[in-house]
Amino acid sequence: SLEVIGVHKDGGMCERLVLPARKLHPSEKLTMEQLALVETLAIGCNCVNRSASSSGDKVLVIGAGPIGMAAIEFLKVAKTEITVMDMNETRLQFCKEKLGVDHTVVFKNDGTEADRLREVNGGELPITVIDATGSHVSMSNAFQYVSFTGQVLYVGITTQELSFKHVTIHRPELTIKASRNAVPGDFKRIISLIEDGVIDTDPWLSHQASYDDFIPEFPNWLKPETGVIKAVLHMN
């Protein structure tokens, strides 16, 4: 029965909207820019909650986009050892320098990824793999990067079929999970973490534009070389 305004129901672009007060998550401390990030971060929060990751766990995040980065924020809170894999080296550098992940691995699609993951993780594969790519190819191949009795968690979404041999998950006794959304408690927790300075939103807010500047600015945001992480549109 989950319904999201602007997704399942019309009204996401209304100037004014009447909602039950219990659906709102206010903060007297955060800026509007910070509040705009809460929903994005909630996807990562729920994902890490579903993974039940704990301190010292070796975790691989595949995909250094906003969803993968959101997961990273809460893996940091859980004090896990984080490796990020992506084909975009600029994004990997951002994750290393701005988000403080432990290791990065460039995806080259040459069959060396598992060995390189072992190299940076002390000879072991991660116990948890979070696939945030939304690519059915990546999601079908994620099992080769996880250790025995580990888990693969899908937070990226695809409409394509996933294909893998049963023995791929049966022999190493893997667990498969999915993470779709967030719950009200996640929003309250995220607001508190930002208010307390545990999560730094500054690296996320890479670009901003006024309402009048949005039309000429938007095409630039679509260019990879622009380095957009999250862009904020000011409506005033």
PLM ranges: what are they?
Residues 89-91, 111, 136, 159:
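Helix N-cap at the beta1-alpha1 junction of Rossmann-like dinucleotide-binding domains, i.e.
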Residues 53, 121, 133, 146-147:
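A generic alpha-to-beta junction signature in SAM-dependent methyltransferases
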Residues 136-196, 234-236:
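Glycine-rich phosphate-binding loop and adjacent beta-alpha segment
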Residues 124-132:
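Short SAM/SAH-binding signature in class I
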Residues 110-123:
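Short amphipathic alpha-helix with an adjacent loop that forms part of the alpha/beta core around
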Residues 1-24:
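Glycine-rich phosphate/adenylate-binding loop and adjacent beta-alpha elements
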Residues 30-109:
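Mid-domain Rossmann-like dinucleotide-binding core that forms the NAD(H)/NADP(H) cofactor-binding site
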Residues 140-141, 184-236:
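C-terminal hydrophobic helical "lid"/dimerization subdomain
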